[in-house]
Amino acid sequence: MPRRLILSATERGTLLALPESQDDLIRYYTFNDSDLSLIRQRRGDANRLGFAVQLCLLRYPGYALGTDSELPEPVILWVAKQVQTDPASWTKYGERDVTRREHAQELRTYLQLAPFGLSDFRALVRELTELAQQTDKGLLLAGQALESLRQKRRILPALSVIDRACSEAIARANRRVYRALVEPLTDSHRAKLDELLKLKAGSSITWLTWLRQAPLKPNSRHMLEHIERLKTFQLVDLPEVLGRHIHQNRLLKLAREGGQMTPKDLGKFEPQRRYATLAAVVLESTATVIDELVDLHDRILVKLFSGAKHKHQQQFQKQGKAINDKVRLYSKIGQALLEAKEAGSDPYAAIEAVIPWDEFTESVSEAELLARPEGFDHLHLVGENFATLRRYTPALLEVLELRAAPAAQGVLAAVQTLREMNADNLRKVPADAPTAFIKPRWKPLVITPEGLDRRFYEICALSELKNALRSGDIWVKGSRQFRDFDDYLLPAEKFAALKREQALPLAINPNSDQYLEERLQLLDEQLATVARLAKDNELPDAILTESGLKITPLDAAVPDRAQALIDQTSQLLPRIKITELLMDVDDWTGFSRHFTHLKDGAEAKDRTLLLSAILGDAINLGLTKMAESSPGLTYAKLSWLQAWHIRDETYSAALAELVNHQYQHAFAAHWGDGTTSSSDGQRFRAGGRGESTGHVNPKYGSEPGRLFYTHISDQYAPFSTRVVNVGVRDSTYVLDGLLYHESDLRIEEHYTDTAGFTDHVFALMHLLGFRFAPRIRDLGETKLYVPQGVQTYPTLRPLIGGTLNIKHVRAHWDDILRLASSIKQGTVTASLMLRKLGSYPRQNGLAVALRELGRIERTLFILDWLQSVELRRRVHAGLNKGEARNSLARAVFFNRLGEIRDRSFEQQRYRASGLNLVTAAIVLWNTVYLERATQGLVEAGKPVDGELLQFLSPLGWEHINLTGDYVWRQSRRLEDGKFRPLRMPGKP
């Protein structure tokens, strides 16, 4: 059986692609005087040109010219121009093979290159094995191999040799990973791992299948079941050191492979691989269960508190009429008493003139019942749900291993008290129980004359535990999402080394004094400029007075002439089925090749099956209904393909392919250069089985839902999407899309709406090199912050909210740089850090310092906004593109009433990724045919104003048939270079 190739044909072409753009030709193939002197020693144009070309190829990419090498025309033209020869003479070079070999030998000596030999192959495999322990992606390994050989000044061998070296390195790395996971295991561990493949007692599924099931609903019953899962994992009792020296990517991939396999498949593995795979599954699944338990507990508490608040409001509203009646009555009584005092008459008689004394006495009693305590709050109603918490919290606290930072030691001590009370079945809280963690709001309920109230002490401790877990002040052993805050960051030694070497991956001056002096000086100048413009009433389309700020709304952005062109081009676009559109786009881009097999990296053999699974995600149909709607397909086939070929990383790679094609398409340049983008959240209601996984945000009503948060470039390409909770602020995820997309876009400026900004985001955006420009609603209410000691600006007084605490920034400068560097290098995601920073108590030093830094940037941005109508137009236009893209997404995601009905978060992610991929395909297809439509108008004698092309949009879908049976007719595929006919008037 032939060895499976690591590199695909496309990847091979990418690795040794020759430069063709003018900039790249100048960079790689510009000769110096020494080069030209050597070249001129050749006789005849053909020899000079051939010798020069060989010199170029040996220098970059680094391989020798073969007898059958085909070179791009731009390379020949550029080299010929430099050596002043006729490009046509290239065809005559190498007629004598001896000449070509002699030239190659001379150039090897000149460039000090050595041929690639067996010893080099062995050394390369050893080197690649280290990298292969981190990733088994062939393209990354091959790229590293080529770079290493160039540094060692070796002539590159054939790519088949590189492929073989990568393959051997991956095999060696796999064996090392297996060995690292298996050697620490005892016979007892192995026996317990084997037990996981057996049927669970009284069930038709194995222990492993049951253990990997996600909780269905956030309630006490499912919490207890999930706690049992964690206890079962803990009984396996794997060594603590297991997996610590294995790269997380490899461990996760091995766990995914094991999760997709049947017990029968796993049982067929040789022992070392079987135990390694099972150990990886247990390690990853244990962390997942811990994170899910903490999240479930968080959601249950949020639900109980929200319910108490809602009930509190309902009670208050129900008593509103009675309270109003009492207020009106006592107002009359008060007025009567005032008049009686002025007249010197009997006050009691005055009261009885308003209401009989018996009724007055009764009204006072009623008022006492209606009256609320001074700390009018809903917390007392939370106690009604104490029984819900008691069903599972004793088991939860017992199974979680908690650690705490100094700031949360009081909370951890309270948790330990609860554990001891549960163990001893105590009903009363000990008098010496810790109370320092109790916030003022809770004290009246917890600390009573009779002692500490058991219900409210426990609820308060659990609530504070939830907050501390969110912020990272308390962490859980074995968790991924709830670890020690410092564990997420670059190691202190590595950060110190980067700073010392001036190699921090940040876009600012790392010297705090110089940086702050520069920013504060700029801030002072901008404040003075805006104050002067406001005083002279010269702010463009804005007025600032004592009563506040007023900005004139922007005019309509689309002129009438542009609308006519929009209508003309949309009528010309060919009508097409969504299946045919996806086949067209895949023929152009080959995006389907990125959906590789999880185990061996092979491309999907059945493209129709793959595209059907993707489309099933995109239109929210699901695999079962997709199989019914696609002749020749079955659920089993689609399910198998999804399990092995569809993952987050394959969706990301395929999306990047489409975004890159859009980025490189000439017509897309009419809409932007790919350096600006916007992001927005789109809510989808959670229904059916997915309802229990949804979250409620009062902004969207009382129904649960999920948010698809998507980034879109100025060229309309949606380059990132993720599923988030509707209860989390959009700003948490803004940076993720900018930092972790895989496309060639180089975003410099980013737009969001009001929900997309916080001061922390402003700070991190600036530190990481992005210009942040949110469209802030009620801008006049968003205050400016000024440096201490600067002159006052009376004109700006309505906008100024306070002074900046620069001392805090200086004190925590290294912490800020370390955090930003960690995010940039991918040690931790921006969203995770922003969630934790947002959950910190107000006194946390890093959170406050980052907020102050963000206030500087937010103030500078607002001052810029007030001075620039062009900035307002850019932001408005960018956000409009995102909103229009949401309309397209809503149209595509039409099945199941547009509701999220998938129970697992993984399936919900696939829905979002499939939707984003298909909308990106529609955008690219429309871009191609909008260009052809404008060309068609010109050819028909209807001139097109180039200035109006920016107003066209590739987001239309009226010409696309999204419904019906999903048939993939290969007969409808186009030949290379062919296009579908436009709907020109007068043509059939």
Curated annotation (Swiss-Prot):
Where do transmembrane segments lie in this chain?
none
DNA-binding as UniProt keyword:
yes
> Which InterPro entries has this protein been placed in?
DUF4158, Tn3-like_transpos, Tn3_Tnp_DDE_dom
Q: Which UniProt keywords apply?
A: DNA recombination, DNA-binding, Plasmid, Transposable element, Transposition
Identify the Pfam families for this entry: DDE_Tnp_Tn3, DUF4158
Record GO terms (molecular function): DNA binding; transposase activity
Which GO terms of type biological process are on file?
Answer: DNA transposition
Explain the purpose of this protein.
Required for transposition of transposon Tn501.
Q: Member of which family? A: Belongs to the transposase 7 family.
Q: What is this protein called?
A: Transposase for transposon Tn501
